[in-house]
């Protein structure tokens, strides 16, 4: 396994010089060609996907996981759209983001360049193969793809078609997209040790996967941790906004990382806002896990038919990423308490305040330490496309390099570029005597 990992990483590293200087128009042509190959090979892709579905059933994968694994007409069309959209994005490679002149006449600037070789580990959804490969390729990064063992046939045909498109346009560049076509976990461990060959790892999946990668890796890891997101409804909130925002953030799509898991309510809203909000959520099949105060408010005949969905919260509930129609509820006495709660239980992903008080809103924005912080809007907008950034690799909760949606630009890094005209530090050059001796003009 060590030899296999070393071989694939060496191949990916070798194409970086050619890839980094590839004309943006050529990159876009390749992406469009991949989209054409997906259209032309829909039946083949679905045939390979059927093999994965059978394997998934044989290892008793859950129905939800099998649903995520399925690739039909809709999913293939979605991949085609991703490729077409990425082709339209502005290429960040080579962009000079700033330039200035210092006292000695040096012109100093910053230029965006690729990260290098990116190792992406992901689970189930085969569309990630196309999404990750297209973003890495457009940003001139070589990528090593390692999908879940249950999707190996689908992922392989998708990566093979991508490599075919590259081969058709540029000789010797197909290793810009490498696919790990073996199921052994040891390969992942070996690739995570290859400092100098692999530049960064990006795990996309559950918390256990991300922790395992972070603890094993010798290379840099950009983490996309779980989304324990909260909304705080302040006592100066516009309640009409609050009802809809909370509903949207929990109910619209509960299985994603930017849906809320905790609802924090100011105690002044317990009598009026909370019973109505609770009824909206319960009628929408949401299970409520309440603290003492919010639980007591719901102990009347209006809620008798929902008794099975009204429970007392445990400490563990507030840390939990449910990814389901379950919501933990906490009441607080102040903005300070709300922010303390979010700091303790949140995952620094996306959090929101609903208030009409500008001072409170600005304080929340400044003090809540999350990748995305909202005022009077649903947390469900934390997404590359929704932010106007285009397709993304995920939502980074790290504080180094990239934070929030990791779109095309976030797959590059800045380096310094310096233009001079013979400047010397402290004007120290070759001594006159040595110049004369060696006859240097």
UniProtKB/Swiss-Prot annotation:
Enzyme Commission number: 1.2.1.41
Single GO cellular component term: cytoplasm
Pathway assigned to this chain's UniProt record: Amino-acid biosynthesis; L-proline biosynthesis; L-glutamate 5-semialdehyde from L-glutamate: step 2/2
Gene Ontology terms: biological process: L-proline biosynthetic process
Annotated keywords: Amino-acid biosynthesis, Cytoplasm, NADP, Oxidoreductase, Proline biosynthesis
Principal subcellular localization: cytoplasm
Amino-acid biosynthesis as UniProt keyword: yes
Top-rank lineage group of the source organism: Bacteria
A Pfam family of this chain: Aldedh
Cytoplasm listed as a keyword: yes
Similarity comment: Belongs to the gamma-glutamyl phosphate reductase family.
Biological role stated in the UniProt entry: Catalyzes the NADPH-dependent reduction of L-glutamate 5-phosphate into L-glutamate 5-semialdehyde and phosphate. The product spontaneously undergoes cyclization to form 1-pyrroline-5-carboxylate.
Protein known as: Gamma-glutamyl phosphate reductase
Annotated source species: Hydrogenobaculum sp. (strain Y04AAS1)
